[in-house]
Amino acid sequence: MPEICPICGLPKDLCVCEEIAKEEQKIKVYVTKRRFGKLMTVVDGFDADLIDVKDLAKKLKDICACGGTVKKDSIELQGDHRKKAEEILIKMGFSKDMIDVR
């Protein structure tokens, strides 16, 4: 007997909770300056209960070819990757209207 998702009530292999959550996230992408003048792209605004932030960070780091980390519910990427991060998030299923790039 397959496991049932507690949120949507569907079997785990048919669960659509993460897909629905991706469309509802209000994401902010911005650049900050860190120690020694280095730039850091911050992708913020994820609901960690619904989206696997660590897996998303790994995919962003692989595609952007940079280092980075996950702090609380935000992803930090080394360098200025605002445009590339926005394109990647849109391809992953996040709504273009809900992504705010500064």
Swiss-Prot record:
It comes from Methanococcus vannielii. GO terms for biological process: formation of translation preinitiation complex; regulation of translation; translation reinitiation. The keyword Protein biosynthesis applies. Belongs to the SUI1 family. Coiled coil: none annotated. SUPFAM superfamilies: eIF1-like. Gene3D superfamilies: SUI1-like domain (3.30.780.10). GO terms for molecular function: mRNA binding; translation initiation factor activity. InterPro entries: DENR/SUI1_TIF, SUI1, SUI1_arc, SUI1_arc_bac, SUI1_dom_sf. NCBIfam families: PRK00939.1 (NF002096), SUI1_rel (TIGR01158). Keywords: Protein biosynthesis, Translation regulation. This is Protein translation factor SUI1 homolog. The keyword Ligase does not apply. It comes from the Archaea.
